[in-house]
Amino acid sequence: MSSAKRPIEPLSGGTLVLGALAIGMANFMMVLDTTIANVAVPTISGNLGVAPDQGTWVLTSFSISLAIGLPLTGWLAQRFGQVKLFLSAVVLFVLASVCCGLAPNLTSLLVFRVFQGAVCGPLAPLSQALLVAIFPPARRTTALVVWSMTTFLGPVCGPILGGYLTDNISWPWIFYINVPVGIFILLTLGQVLNGRDNPTRKLPVDVVGLLLLMVAVGSLQILLDKGQDLDWFSAAPIRILAVITVLGFASLITWELTAQHPILDLRLFKERNYAIGTLSVSLGFALYFASLVLVPLWLQTEMGYTATWAGIATAPLGIAGVVLAPFIGRLMQHTDARVLASMAFICWIGASLWRMYFETNLDIQFIGWNSVLMGAGTAFLFTPLVAISLSRLPPEKIPAALGLQNALRMTGASFAVSLGPAFWDHRARQHQVDLAERMTPFDHWSAQAQDNLNNLGLSAQGALESLARTIDRQAHMLALNDFSLASAWLFCAVLAIVWLARSPKAKAK
């Protein structure tokens, strides 16, 4: 073991403020890149000459490589030091962002997005760990609140900033925007944490575990992304991917439970609160993220919104979270964390049930207020569930626990990016068939609609084409209603899971 640097100790005054701001902005930068591209997918797809469903790989590739890179954080931090790793990740992330903006085609963009996701893996867990380290022990709940607020700011700024840059400048600027933020982080932390780091030691890397993780997660992600296009298990490639996925995860779990230095410390799940907290935050965030991707896509492809207006309509998702986050720390002092976590899912259930009644003629204010309620749930998600997860773990296990939890959370988000649009498209096709079957000369509604269109000067063929577009729009609206109902039921299930945890304030026996 070697350590020539001073340990990371609590800061105070202006130094603490600057350090917390820079560390929080690094987490914000990472979260921003998971949401800023959401509203830009249709534009990126069009400019690069690919279909919108192919364009969603811009989101998927980042999320899946991030999920694979996250578990390496614990090993890398012990090998190179938390501060050195953190600053290196920022440098590489900025470099990857520039490369993404310069990408001439979808293939190169996806390669750079994979690189971007992999190198920013340490930012989320290390931003948590460093914030906890620089705050005095009595104010460590404040550190988690700061981290949560920067996480909420991503959904607030991402859609608006992404929409504005896409509509008014060009889509590469959604990546170039990371450059000044990264420079500020490097300059600030280079001064605030100069000469400070944790002790380092050489550890063998779990190469087998890493390869199994890449195979298992990668094959599952490809299966989910391509399943809809290939008609799922009727296609041989999907069946082969399913077998690889099952064998990959079975081998990964078996290996990691017996490895001396596992890349994923699955033994952490023996602690009940950690298992329940991690499962709850992963499932909850996945469902939330699916909505975060699907609603802007619906607004642009079916409702005629520009990227900017789609961003404005969904930006309130994070406003309530930012406003409520400072109060969560105070509530945590005298309220059961399970109660606060339950509030997240209650808000999401209410917002999902409300969204079931969306229609194609609703205005942007209606969508915005629904987003406020959806966003309020985010304020109650992270801090209580992280507190539940870590409440019974020894301090030396916390970095690995945070890395694994963030990995599973982002893996769930990447799966949601694939499954959400696939479910939406599948239900839309079913509704299209049902609605089209009613378009007969004997159906009063279709006959009257066609007569009205003919009276407006449309030919018979033009009237039929107009009705077909209306059916397509209504089918996708009904499909979004179906997605909202399914989300509400799943949120109810996760709400029940939260209460299987022990109260963090109860003493461990």
Question: Language-model features: where?
Answer:
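Hydrophobic transmembrane architecture of multi-pass small-molecule transporters
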Residues: S2, E9, F184, L404, ...
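Transmembrane core module of solute transporters
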Residues: G14-Q78, V83-F86, T107-L110, S170, ...
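Transmembrane alpha-helical cores of Major Facilitator Superfamily
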Residues: F28, T60-I64, V91, V145-M149, ...
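Cytoplasmic loop-to-transmembrane helix junctions
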Residues: Q54, R139-V146, K397-L404
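Hydrophobic/small/kink-forming positions within alpha-helical transmembrane segments
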Residues: A67-I68, V98, F152, V156, ...
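Helix-loop-helix hairpins in multi-pass membrane proteins, especially solute transporters
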Residues: L70-G209, A235
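Small-residue-rich alpha-helical segments with characteristic i,i+4
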Residues: P155-P159, S291, I367-S446
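C-terminal membrane-cytosol helix-exit motif in multi-pass small-molecule transporters
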Residues: P180-N198, M214-K226, I244-T258, L495-R502
